[in-house]
Amino acid sequence: TDATADYYTAIKMGDVDLSLTAGGTSFELDGTLSIDTFDRNGVASPTGATPGERLDWSTAFDFDSDGTADTFDPGAELPTPQDLTIDFTDSLQYRLSGSVTGDGNDLDGNPGTVFLNAGDVSFAGSAEFALSRWTVDATHSSGVLTDTTLDSYAFSLNDVTLEVDSVATFSVTGAVGFAKVTPTDATADYYTAIKMGDVD
């Protein structure tokens, strides 16, 4: 009822066919995306101020007032019901899966077919993907980093160029997982990890 309070939005898509052209600010991917699934947990302020935490949709509602959280499934109201249960925790920002064909620049700024630039790592070509972004606390040797951004990527690759700056450039076919942790302090170190499975 407070017109100045934050408001909360959620989107859930399952088994959809959606195409869009992405820039580097769209899920950190550059190129043409074909989306199969998409979940988003949003919070915004009507006053333009910095919003607070996102909603934990898995515990937010008690429709029958019995003291137990109830699930919220807008898809249950469709003429042909679909399971679109919105049960996102407040740590989720978004997650999606599909395929991408890159058209971005490489690490040196040269035009190419890069679909992901993340720190000192880039991927070029086309791939199937699953990615997500979360707000989490991360523990490292010096303590706990609070409210970091965790970006998670998984790719199914076919002859994709993987470049690790100042290390090597690879041509990769197979499965690759990549993660990046970014602290709230823009001057602090960020952390990356790559795992390859069944690659050529």
Region spans (language model):
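N-terminal low-complexity, acidic/Ser/Thr/Gly/Pro-rich segments
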Residues: 1-200
